[in-house]
UniProtKB/Swiss-Prot annotation:
Gene Ontology cellular component terms for the protein in this record: cytoplasm
Species for this entry: Clostridium botulinum (strain Kyoto / Type A2)
Domain CP-type G: 64-221
Cited PROSITE patterns: ENGC_GTPASE, G_CP
UniProt KW keywords: Cytoplasm, GTP-binding, Hydrolase, Metal-binding, Nucleotide-binding, Ribosome biogenesis, RNA-binding, rRNA-binding, Zinc
Record protein name field: Small ribosomal subunit biogenesis GTPase RsgA
EC number of the protein: 3.6.1.-
Coiled coil: none
Amino acid sequence: MKGTIIKGIGGFYYIKIDNSEEIIECKARGKFRHTELTPMIGDYVEISIDKNNKGAIEKIYERRSELFRPAVANVTQALVVFSFKNPDINIDLLNKFLLLCEYNNLKAIVCFNKMDLVNKEDYKDIISMIEQAGYDIIFLNAKEERNMDIIKKLIKDNVTVFCGPSGVGKSTMLNKIIGKETMITGNISEKLKRGKHTTRHSELIYVDEGLLVDTPGFSSLDINFMEKEDLLHCIPEFRDFIGECKFTGCLHHREPNCAVKKAVEEGHIHKNRYDFYIKTLEEFMNRRKKKW
């Protein structure tokens, strides 16, 4: 049988079987320890059931993506939630979230919540910057469920994680989407009698024909693990111009005859996005100098 790990706790993994609402408790075979491959929430797996009706994970299929905070595999999209007011928007922080989405090969959709607090026209430059970078935008008021139907449609056939700074309404959005529906994961704790004081772990919730990570993603925004070459490929609007620069390996920094810098000057790339790239690149380069 095949299915998706929707929860893992205390060495036990709970697999939702394909085309079924059945959830089977499994342990991982010891062979995974030798390969240093630990099952993760979101893994697509093959399992076996022995004569005592005990489940075991036999195979973990190749992961399309892998997050570590929270630890979830095969996430397909991130809803990057921000507000213009309460809290005020931090453009560098938004760009950093988008950077991490690109690095993790996630489709990012920017959601601006609390739109009842602002006039959209006052933020048209920020909106233009995001659209120019190629990202879709959804304007929300989650408390009043404005455009939440769009979010629910996006969740279908995807594994979705919410991310964004504190206070922007991620929990409200999650609660509105999950609601009081009867979800197949909802009775796991009751069924297994594990107790109320078990350590909290992320899990996947099956809702609207998709899977939803029940805790916000990217709890750490540390990007120091990245290299400057990674950064170069995590700014999607640069891609049309890579290869047109005079120098192979151009970092679009101080090099002459740079196609990216020319695109910025001509308005094809938003200056704020380029400035964020340069600021981050210089931080990476200074960090490397300190190592030596």
